[in-house]
Amino acid sequence: MARDVTSLGSMVVLCFLLAAVVGYLLLVRKRGAALLVVGSILGGTVISFGLKLLFNRPRPEIPGGIQVFTASFPSSHAMLSAVTYLTLGVLMTRVAAGARLKAYFIGLAVFLTVVIGLSRVYVGVHYATDVLAGWCVGSAWAALCWVVALRLQRRGQVEQPGTSDVPDGTSIE
């Protein structure tokens, strides 16, 4: 089960999720939001692999464990899960009606981020500090991207959530 959970933070799963969300945003003519989501996740990916190259920390040596060929610090699964799921969670809160639904989306994003990170330690491919660093850097990057998105929305450079220019009247509300 831990390997199933850890796969939720894999590049394959995150790329499919990114493609699905961006496809949806483009269909409802939220090009600015789509660009911000892509920029957030691609930026997080570049930062993650840049930090791996900088620190080049070896992984834990577990006989018979999962073979991984990149450096250990920081955990890309933990970092990119934080960036992706927290960004999408906040995106959903911008269109969700009611505090309960907003709390659900943020709670789900945090839960996924935490269990994916913990699974990396459990399966023996990271030290706890790798995961903690991934969570911290990923959360900080996601927060910075949210601030940029809010400023761009206030300036009118990115469309406000909840409005749609789709001809058939489809809205994301």
Task: Locate predicted features.
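Hydrophobic alpha-helical bundle signature of multipass membrane enzymes
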Residues: 1-71, 87-94, 107
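Membrane-embedded catalytic cores of phosphoryl/pyrophosphoryl-handling enzymes
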Residues: 60-173
